[in-house]
């Protein structure tokens, strides 16, 4: 009987941590950040003590017009998205961003660089919009299996990230389970 008791005591702390690894928002962060341990650790902190995380990142939240009156789920959603932006796994462009700014933001994404995806200015028309430019990238990167996806943050900006096409359905479902939205950037 002593064997089982000591084994249970050893497994106790691991079992307590397990739900944090299976939370839909952490799974989203894991996929988008390519399993980056530093980002996952920060995302866990955001979710474990949202109010403390909010206070530490007060300037970022206030820039988005958010306060502690917003729901914890919304604060966690935005906190994790800002974390991905800060670490260049996502980028944010205003709805009226010029082509040069869009191209710079997308080409600076870590996963675009990691996968050596080409971006040529000649593919785009400057008078078009971000959803149209993202549709062009989706077509150009189709053979490589990547698309431009986006987080809906209920604003007039686009928060985009490179997504393996085969992960998009899972990310969409995970976001929906939290009451939020991820979709192809061209659909935003």
What do the PLM-derived regions correspond to, one by one?
Residues 1-188:
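Contiguous interface-forming segments/domains that mediate binding rather than catalysis
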């Amino acid at each position: 009987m002593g064997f089982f008791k000591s084994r249970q005591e050893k497994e106790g702390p691991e079992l307590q941590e397990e739900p944090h690894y299976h939370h839909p928002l952490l799974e989203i962060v894991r996929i988008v950040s390519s399993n980056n341990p530093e980002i996952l650790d920060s995302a866990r902190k955001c979710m474990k003590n949202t109010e403390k995380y909010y206070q530490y990142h007060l300037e970022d939240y206030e820039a988005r017009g958010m306060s502690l009156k917003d729901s914890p789920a919304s604060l966690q959603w935005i906190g994790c998205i800002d974390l991905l932006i800060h670490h260049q796994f996502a980028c944010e462009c205003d709805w009226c961003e010029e082509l040069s700014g869009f191209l710079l933001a997308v080409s600076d994404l870590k996963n675009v660089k990691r996968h050596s995806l080409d971006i040529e200015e000649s593919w785009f028309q400057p008078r078009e919009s971000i959803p149209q430019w993202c549709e062009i990238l989706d077509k150009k990167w189709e053979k490589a299996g990547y698309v431009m996806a986006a987080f809906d943050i209920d604003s007039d900006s686009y928060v985009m990230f490179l997504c393996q096409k085969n992960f998009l359905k899972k990310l969409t479902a995970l976001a929906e389970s939290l009451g939020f939205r991820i979709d192809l950037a061209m659909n935003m």
